[in-house]
């Protein structure tokens, strides 16, 4: 299974969103050598004013794979971006994990992951996706969702029109 979360994936996501002229949001990116490090999201109001909404920070490993996506939200009362949550990506031979950690403002640090999603190769053109959530009362994780995702492979269809 090859990594699907690369610099090119993040760049494509940004350009697809930014080029939709009818979208209610506007995007501003920090792009350096074809690599997106930050995206700011603003909502377009009816009076053509822009309202800050979200800010995303991206980090990559030496292979160009996404390792961290930090999400910040705009705090209107403080007039500044504040940490919200973080996705951390860990890559393995047969897939990758995505861990979600929430920001603890009292500790000024991210908590231990509250959710972990495992993406694993399950066969040709198939990926197993399992999500585990933290059970706070028992201090362990439980399986909350499991599915198989199949890629469309038109060349392997048995019938044609």
Please identify what each model-predicted range represents.
Residues 1-10:
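Sec-dependent signal peptide recognition
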Residues 11-161:
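Buried hydrophobic residues that stabilize the cores of well-folded domains
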